């Protein structure tokens, strides 16, 4: 199983590969999904419903149905406060936001839109929800972010954040998904809607300055003084995303030497280098997508980027270039749990470290040395929301370059991923310690081992994906992996006992995890070795053989 790199990866996209925005938006309004076709139904994945108008998987009917379903959920749960509505810069986000507002206004929901129709990062919406709900038991707020995250320009996405401020959990998304599909099957009978112009004038439609509310609070989570006093030269590439105007405001408010590489917003994302597979993808953890910033890394002491809704980060140092996501997570954990005295002063119990089952084992070793509890969850940031809100978790991070952490005083910051705060933390680390995160990770690797890791994927039918998700330890008959005895086989996360949607196999010197993709006909294998690259290759090869054998077996 090898990942085929596209010959144009890392290079500008030819004009022929750019989307026709007008045609895409026209398809959004004109094409009607068929709910008898599985691919055209509402389906919430790891974070929201995603699809493309070209495929009839993200069209106006989907958004109308999902929004009405969210209203029904709010009503059933007694959620009576405002709904914070944010969007990113994908071509389908603005029309989908308009559709959602038409339904919300028709149903009498107080909606908070951004002033001047400013783009709205996911963390700014999470921050707004938590700020409103602080100290309240009634009139609680929730939110919607219209974003497909780092997905290609042809895609749209729609995700719901309940009153805890983070991504909705499975119980909620299953309820909304079922209700939305019922409405689709009824050809939108039961969906209330008013024209956009009327919705914008409605007494329930309000404007909020998300940008200044969020930027004004950033000093409560990041030590801006130490960054400014160190006179760090910083660079940021917003990748044409929702935080594109936030960075200049941050630099001005906190008087930082922060250069914004580009503030261009283009729904074709023509400025993006192609990703590994030849697609345009605003992924700040991809060395191909990040080529523009990596090429000028020597101009800055530290540089960073965020994806389209600014919930994910990418860190670039002069010596290393783009850091692997797990490398930065480890450096961030090591720093935070030694430089946040306010956490110990204000939290009743020591804050724990949250990671997913596919994140590096180096984090386990580091956390143990720090004397902190490790809470290992399934993939999906929704699993961390409650722990972040309560202060049980001081930090939560995913190997896909998503993380957030508590404010400096130990109170909750966001319960969704925050690429802006994670990016700025890299500057605080550099300023306070004199070593950038790449250098700090090198020291951690010297102390705890220098793992090599990789994520690859392979084709799988819908039935095989179901079988993989349903695997249990008894279906894995192998006793060894890459020359080592298998120590444990997991299909539930140690941190909460929830299914991981696949399988994880551990040995003394490495591990692999396999899980089906939520959106494509393939499965993913994550692997790590603390021995060497040859050992990693053996793990990957044997992992695919183990998984292929397991998913080809007849199930009783």
Model region roles, listed by residue range:
Residues 2-106, 200-234, 242:
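An N-terminal, well-structured beta->alpha segment
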Residues 15-18, 23, 27-30, 110-126, ...:
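Phosphate-binding chemistry for phosphorylated carbohydrates and sugar-nucleotides
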Residues 86, 143-149, 305-307, 396-397, ...:
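Short beta-strand segments
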Residues 138-194, 497:
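Flexible glycine-/small-residue-enriched beta->alpha junction loops
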Residues 435-556:
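Catalytic-core signal marking the mid-to-C-terminal active-site face
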């Amino acid at each position: 199983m090898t990942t085929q790199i596209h010959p144009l990866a890392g290079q500008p996209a030819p004009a022929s590969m750019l989307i026709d925005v007008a045609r895409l938006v026209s398809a959004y309004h004109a094409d009607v999904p068929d709910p008898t076709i599985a691919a055209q139904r509402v389906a919430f994945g790891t974070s929201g419903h995603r699809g493309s108008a070209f495929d009839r998987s993200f069209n106006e009917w989907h958004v109308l149905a999902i929004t009405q379903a969210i209203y029904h959920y709010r009503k059933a749960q007694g959620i009576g406060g405002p709904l914070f509505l944010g969007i990113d810069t994908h071509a389908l986000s603005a029309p989908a936001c308009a559709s959602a507002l038409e339904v919300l206004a028709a149903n009498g929901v107080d909606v908070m839109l951004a002033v001047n129709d400013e783009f709205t990062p996911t963390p700014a919406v999470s921050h707004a929800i938590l700020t409103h709900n602080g100290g309240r038991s009634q009139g609680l707020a929730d939110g919607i972010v219209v974003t497909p995250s780092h997905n290609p320009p042809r895609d749209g996405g729609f995700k719901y954040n309940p009153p805890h401020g983070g991504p909705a959990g499975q119980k909620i998304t299953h309820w909304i998904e079922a209700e939305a599909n019922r409405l689709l099957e009824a050809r939108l009978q039961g969906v209330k809607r008013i024209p956009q112009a009327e919705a914008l004038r409605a007494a329930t439609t309000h404007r909020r300055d998300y940008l200044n509310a969020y930027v004004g609070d950033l000093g409560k989570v990041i030590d801006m003084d130490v960054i400014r006093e160190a006179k760090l030269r910083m660079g940021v590439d917003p990748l044409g995303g929702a935080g594109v105007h936030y960075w200049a405001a941050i630099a001005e408010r906190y008087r930082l030497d922060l250069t914004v590489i580009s503030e261009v917003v283009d729904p074709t994302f023509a400025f993006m280098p192609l990703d590994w597979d030849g697609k345009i993808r605003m992924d700040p953890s991809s060395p191909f997508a990040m080529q523009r910033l990596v090429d000028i890394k020597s101009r800055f002491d530290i540089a960073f980027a965020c994806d389209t809704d600014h919930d994910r980060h990418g860190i670039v140092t002069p010596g290393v270039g783009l850091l692997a996501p797990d490398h930065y997570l480890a450096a961030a954990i090591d720093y935070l749990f030694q430089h946040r005295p306010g956490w110990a002063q204000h939290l009743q119990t020591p804050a724990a470290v949250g990671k997913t089952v596919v994140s590096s084992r180096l984090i386990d070793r580091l956390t143990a040395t720090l004397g902190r509890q490790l809470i290992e969850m399934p993939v999906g940031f929704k699993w961390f929301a409650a722990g972040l809100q309560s202060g049980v978790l001081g930090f939560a991070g995913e190997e896909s370059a998503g993380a957030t952490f508590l404010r400096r005083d130990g109170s909750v910051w966001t319960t969704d991923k925050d690429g802006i705060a994670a990016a700025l933390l890299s500057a605080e680390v550099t300023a306070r310690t004199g070593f950038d995160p790449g250098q700090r990770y090198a020291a951690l690797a010297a102390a705890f081992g220098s793992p090599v890791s990789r994520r690859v994927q392979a084709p799988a039918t819908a039935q095989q994906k179901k079988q993989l998700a349903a695997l249990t330890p008894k279906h894995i008959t192998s006793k060894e992996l890459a020359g080592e005895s298998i120590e444990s086989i997991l299909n539930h996360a140690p941190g909460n006992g929830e299914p991981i949607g696949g399988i994880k196999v551990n040995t003394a010197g490495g591990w692999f995890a396999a899980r089906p993709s939520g959106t494509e006909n393939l499965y993913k294998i994550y692997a790590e070795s603390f021995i060497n690259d040859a050992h990693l290759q053996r793990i990957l090869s044997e992992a695919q053989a183990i998984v292929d054998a397991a998913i080809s077996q007849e199930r009783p």
